[in-house]
């Protein structure tokens, strides 16, 4: 199982990489724009924040296959082993095929349906990213889409992995993992929620209180 953070916040990545067993960091154009740092600045910073380890993902901006390939080459000039995110449009599928032929790893993104995701894997994408919460927001079932996609990839494109994205709650992420999803990417707020349990803090405080009462200190 691979756990990623979906952010361009360098400080947060450095802090959470100390706590979480991170496989890397994913970004998209909206995330990069919100951080107001250009790719050639923020991507090396994110790489350094992870201690020079882990996989980085960044997305193309062009809308034609040829343009997407050119964008991919630009991204690879910044981070040599970056995974290139390509929207799974008709042109995106063509670009994924072209990048596969060049040995450049890709992630098929903006996936709203299992069939769409399967096509990106068959075209050569190493990862496929269904948008769980956005599918729910459109009246679908994000978890069912992940379940269906996982089964399709297992049967027809076992070399590819589901990398589920677009979460609003930890429960959505856990349901994806229970459905067999091999990897997830979490926004910072959801990642923080996974380690924020008021009942745990209360339990630790009670342990300290009892120990202090018995031994007059809080150390062993």
Curated annotation (Swiss-Prot):
E.C. designation(s): 4.1.2.-
UniProt xrefs under SUPFAM superfamilies: Aldolase
pH dependence: Optimum pH is about 8.5. Active from pH 6 to 12.
Pfam families: TAL_FSA
Thermal properties of activity per the entry: Displays a broad temperature optimum and is active in the range from 20 to 75 degrees Celsius. Although no significant loss of activity is detected after 600 hours of incubation at 45 degrees Celsius (at pH 8.0), the respective half-lives of the enzyme are 200 hours at 55 degrees Celsius, 30 hours at 65 degrees Celsius, and 16 hours at 75 degrees Celsius.
Primary location group: cytoplasm
Applied biotechnology uses: Is an interesting tool in chemoenzymatic synthesis for the construction of chiral complex polyhydroxylated sugar-type structures. The use of hydroxyacetone (acetol) as a donor compound allows access to various 1-deoxysugars. Can also be used for the synthesis of a broad range of iminocyclitols, that are potent glycosidase and glycosyltransferase inhibitors, from dihydroxyacetone, hydroxyacetone or 1-hydroxy-butan-2-one as donor substrate, and a range of acceptor substrates.
Leading EC class: lyase
InterPro entries per the UniProt record, alphabetical: Aldolase_TIM, F6P_aldolase, TAL/FSA, Transaldolase_3B/F6P_aldolase, Transaldolase_AS, TSA/FSA_arc/bac
GO BP term (any one): ketone catabolic process
Subcellular localization: Cytoplasm
UniProt miscellaneous comment: Is not inhibited by EDTA which points to a metal-independent mode of action.
Protein name as it appears in the record: Fructose-6-phosphate aldolase 1
Organism per entry: Escherichia coli (strain K12)
